[in-house]
Amino acid sequence: SVLKSMELDKDNQYLEHNKQILNVLANGYYNHYVSYLDTNNYVKAVDFYQEFKALKKVTDQSVDFNQYEIQHCIMLAQIYKQLYHNDENAIHFIQKAIDSYQCVLALDENNYSANKNLGILYHNLGVETIMKELPVDADLEVVIVMEEKAVNYFTKSLPYLKKVYKMEPTDEAIVHGIAAVYYSLNDTEQHIKYYNLYRDLKNSNSNND
């Protein structure tokens, strides 16, 4: 194997040649990784990605994987969200999606996509919790717990949406999302403020079309 060849090549006579071969192999693993990124094959995709990283490190120990990791975690989060939407009882996939976005923010706290998606994800979880049908004879304590759970999701949503709003204050979807969160939190003043901003943006954008 190439790795064995590098180990035996004490004088580094074939170092560059071996590195070129490893680069080709690494790129092959990366291409397989990309082609397997879907809800059916994502586990295999992760394996290919790890193989790609391992070979890349051999060819260049100083290689910076941050951008690869960011893209990888964003793609995995999207897959986990889709798996959850396919089966809403599989709540563990939503936690995996959250963890994946948090992985992105650990590398780049201002990443637009991760902040936006986390904000929307928490908001949607709050809405889903409220919309979940309870038995007619549901205990009051159960109802209160559900309401508290929804409020917790909405509260978690706000910092991410607010951060994205600072980055892109003309994004209609974000402004509307913030207004919706404040509405759900019964904060009428803030809801009206952001709803008016949303309405003004919508009118402004329609006039520009």
Where is each model-derived feature located?
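Short coil/linker segments at helix-helix boundaries
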Residues: 1, 13-16, 81-96, 124-160
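Flexible helix-coil transition and linker loops at the boundaries of alpha-helical arrays
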Residues: 6-21, 54-69, 87, 103-110, ...
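Residue at a conserved register position within TPR or TPR-like alpha-solenoid repeats
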Residues: 29, 36, 80, 122, ...
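Terminal, low-structured helical/coil segments at or just beyond the last alpha-helical repeat
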Residues: 131-159, 163-209
